[in-house]
Every structure is written in C-alpha cells, then in structure tokens.
C-alpha cells in the first residue's frame, strides 16, 4: 500500500473557463445499417445547440473520512481500460468499459460499491477494448450524462453501443477540450482533449480528463498518443498530476518525455493485459518512467488498483483477488 500525506499548498491551477456545450442527437434507422456503419455520411449526424507535486510528505496513519473521500478504481479488465470513480459529492463516473467479455464484471463491481446510478459516463474513443463492455453497463444502471468524441467507426461493437444508447433514449454530449464537467468545493473535472475532430486515427480522438480534488490531481489519457500530448502542451494547459493513467496501455506511441516531465506525476498507472499480443507496455515507456523516478502500477501485476484521498491524505492499494479473474 502506498500512503501520502499532503502538507503543502495546491499545485498551480488554471483559471476557470466557461464553454458552451452541444447535445448530439442521433437519428438512427437501425434496420438500414450497412457495412459502411451507422454513420456512412456526415449528414447523418445532427448537432443541436443546447443550453445544455512536489512531494515531501510523510506516510499517513490517519483514516480517511469516508464522507469526503474521492475513490478511483482502475479496474483490471485485461487489455483494455475501465475506471470507476466515486466522487466526494456522492456522484459517480465511469471512464470506458473494457472489452465485451468484461461487461458483467464491471456491472457487478459497480453494484458492489452500492451504486445504481452513473452520473457521468465517459467513452474516450470507439475502440472495442474501451467500449466493448459499455452496453452491459448502460443497460444495468440509470445514466445521467454520456460524453463521447465526435468520431465514428463501422465496427459491430460501436453499432451495438449506439443501439443501446438509442434504445435507452440517452443523449450524447460531444466532448471537446475545455469542457468543464463539474466544479464545486475544491472538486473539478475538465477535458483537455480531444482538440482534433478529424484525427488520423481514433486513438487521437481520445477524451483526456484532468480531475482535481483539493490539492490532488489525476490525469486520464485514454489512448491519446504523442501527437495529442504535443497539442495539449502547445495550448499551455495545466497537466500537472499526482497520478497519470498512461495513454494507450503503455504503447511507445504515447508518454513522451516532454509530456511526462510536464505532468510530473508520482505514480503512473498502466491498464494492460497479462502477456498481451501487443507487448504492452513498451520497454521504452517503462524506461522513461523509471528514469523520471515515477512509480509504476500495472493492472496485469496488481489487479484492480484503488486510490482514495481526502483533503490531506492519499492512499493507493490493489485488489489481488481479481488479478486472474475470468470475465
């Protein structure tokens, strides 16, 4: 277990910005879907304007107050991503949902936490290892908000997800850099990406989220690659974080030295499958992290990784019981 005690002021924060948002209304006739996918032409998408650290701290021995606790669970979903967050205001957030084989596992994990509502669902990008289990999740819970990048693909997994969204009469909010999802009482969630609505590959359409609670900051990179990292740094966004969820499962296409130095994290979490076919994480990325003295926590080695923090304390632990859980 890793424990930290905060005894210094918060990292420098960005000035608050206000951005308009858009609601994406999907008008789909599923019976006419072809091999070209749900959105064979851009005219089939309708956008409607809407009102819509430095760390010198000693280890903590004090128990975190559950009523004011932020809990982040990096679920062990093999070669995929899924992060379940219980916010200190009682709301919940899910970032991605792994492959389809893990859908029921994710549903049970959320139910075991005592929640029946997901206030924020973030689908970073439409790759199967991020959206495969999402249909099962959407069917199992009350959903309030869904954020997705404005890109599409013709895969069956993506079409199944859109059909579930349609059948549940849910509305997608197109994600873009600068959106502030919430900001209250030292709690803030802001999107740093996507910036490009027509990326060369879907990884670079990924939603990147920065979550802050008091002086603790967390960065969730989806599968964003170095191209996106450069865009974010060019915009002079505040990327500093105590913990970064490494982009693209530790692929060498992500996690440039310049970006890691700007983030300056204590811990890097890598969501990755054991003995995966892609040889993730890349030895080059592991070397970069080690040379920058960033602790590495991997789901293939530890299982589900759980972070809890309040105003002054942060703890990291893992759930070995699910390390080799068959989904």
Predicted regions and their residues:
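Non-globular, low-confidence helical/coil segments that flank catalytic cores
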Residues: 2-13, 18-22, 27-327
